[in-house]
Amino acid sequence: MRYLLPAILLLGTQIASAQSILKDKDDKELSVLLNEVVITGTGTEHYLKDAPVQTEVITSKALEQYQARSIDDLLSGLSPSLTFHDGDMGSHIQLNGLNNDYILIMINGKRMNGDVGGQNDLNQLNPANIERIEIVKGAASSLYGSDAIAGVINIITKRNREKMELTNTSRIGEYGDIRQSTSFGFNYGKIKSVTGINFRHTDGWRNTDLQWDQNQLKSGSTMLTVNRSSNYTLSENIEWQVNRKLDLTAEGTYYERWVMRTHGPWKYQANDFYYRNYTFTVGSKYKLGKRNYLAADLSYGRYGYFYDYKLNEHTDYFLDNDRHERITYFAGQRIKQSIQKQILGQVKSVFYLGEDHILNAGIEYQYNHLESPHHIDGDRASVYTLAAYIQEEWTARENLVLTAGVRGTQHKETGLNFSPKISGLYKPGEHINLRASYALGYKAPTIKELYYNYTGVIGGGALTAYHGNTDLKAQTSQYASIGIEYVGQKFQASLTGYMNYLHNMIELVEIFVTPDEKFLEVEKSKQYKNLTKARIYGMDFTFNYRPAKSLSLAGGYSYADPKAQYPNKGIDYMKYLPIDATSSHNANLNILWQHSWKLYRLGIGIYGRYQSTRRYINDNNADGFQTWRINTAHSLSLIHISEPTRPLYISY
């Protein structure tokens, strides 16, 4: 058991009022699991066991017991299909062989905007504030548009249901790992408000003193595997029920992050990283009666990325004057690298037509503007996307539901595209569900893939130049899946097989280093290019077994074989090679025991995860590994100060 890594974590302190007692929660958990309402697969509400599109749900019970240190830790620990590796640019996510670019991440059904280097920064989210997570795998472009070729992750946050509620979660771990989150919510008449602050810090760590420099592996490096960093998020969410038909919402966030990089042998790290983001969102929902409704949302986000200089640096950029002097940055300066602005508007309607039909239609507009001195020709660029979609759910028979939809998208650079999808749910028996789907996916190149150029070092590797490409085409895919699910009182399991064929897949491809780059000591050069083809074959298996009220077992296995044709491989350009940084085998196993006494509940969990070798085209493969974690959770019921009949819970 070379990679066995047990860890006993006494995590978090939560103080919150609740309306149910501990024993009632135990008795109801099973029925809640079977009747969980999900929305992500079709955009309309369904019980999990009746959802026309296969949906994986991480429940509030699993989240509470796991006590994750981060969203990355939570998702990789509880879903076998997802893998992560932390980086300064954000959360490097993979789902069934495809990376972050092909995964749409949503918060309460709304697109999570803003990224740096193509990576969403999940550090902004507080794990303690999540109610549940819904994961839909496979192309969902007909409903959600670009970024949804691999699937959708919808993070549903908790809503304030009390007149007044204060929640605090604190976590301290090795390597200076500190997580602190506090939220305060109240209800006043028809208005609900939740104010939150989330803080995270790590001193960083490293697993080797070896570093790649000038085509040699040298020892004595001071570079960290994970850099020292701190970040915090301030958030405010307001809901106003104007009347029985109209609901209004408003939300704002402010986020700052500092990443401190070490300076020492082999690399001259003249600067640290600094990020500053803020977002604003307003929304409305108007109920038309009989479950029909109209909804509209408008959001604006501004995402800043800066260098904080700690040493002087003489750059290769020139001042705009007649003397052609080089630009010099001095210690203490904060220099803008990029400012990304995004506007997203959406109008959606859902109509229940009789007992057998649900019509879902909407329009969306998205505008992206990127400003980056010295990295973009003319220092700035922008793209827009305009889309319309329609989807019909038809209950053809009591045990047969068919769903069909299509989306039309107009993109500034790649033009018009149509993305249809059809799926079906058939119930041959009381406990058996059969599902099948076929979809065409669509993914427009990002603004950074089109226009952005930069040079940097990632993970202690070679100094590499990265180049955008304005000749990129839109990526398309053909996705098909078939699955079977068993839903019983004590045992639930699902098995799904899928194929995903991608055309014009965009990847960073190694190109020749130019003489100018060699002069700047650049060791590698890469450019975004459309690959000829890519294909992924895979299967997912998940299960949940509850032999007794106090004991549950859950787990899963995910197999993926992602391969692509690389245009720069000479005579082998037609050969399918593994897609960079992918692993074929991923599995997890969770065992949870819980017992409740009159005022106290104890939970003990064992969590294991296995990941096979991660493969690379031009670099060495990363070894497979397994991790094991032992976790205890304790809940104590006290007397509520203001209302003695209501219990107060302390969990740790």
Question: Where are these predicted regions, by residue range?
Answer:
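Short acidic/polar hinge/loop motifs at secondary-structure boundaries
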Residues: K110-K137
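Extracytoplasmic beta-strand/coil segments of soluble accessory domains associated
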Residues: D72-K110, E131
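Periplasmic-side early beta-strands and strand-to-turn transitions of outer-membrane beta-barrels
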Residues: E162-K163, R171, F186-F273
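Surface-exposed extracellular loop regions of Gram-negative outer-membrane beta-barrel proteins
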Residues: G304, K412-N417, Y426, H431-A480, ...
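Outer membrane beta-barrel strand-and-loop segments of large Gram-negative receptors
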Residues: N227, G332-K348, A381, A387-Y389, ...
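Single conserved hydrophobic/aromatic residue that forms the stacking wall/gate
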Residues: I639-Y652
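N-terminal periplasmic "start-of-domain" segments of outer-membrane beta-barrel proteins
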Residues: L33-A62, H92
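Gram-negative outer-membrane beta-barrel transporters
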Residues: R397-N399, M499-Y501, V522-R614
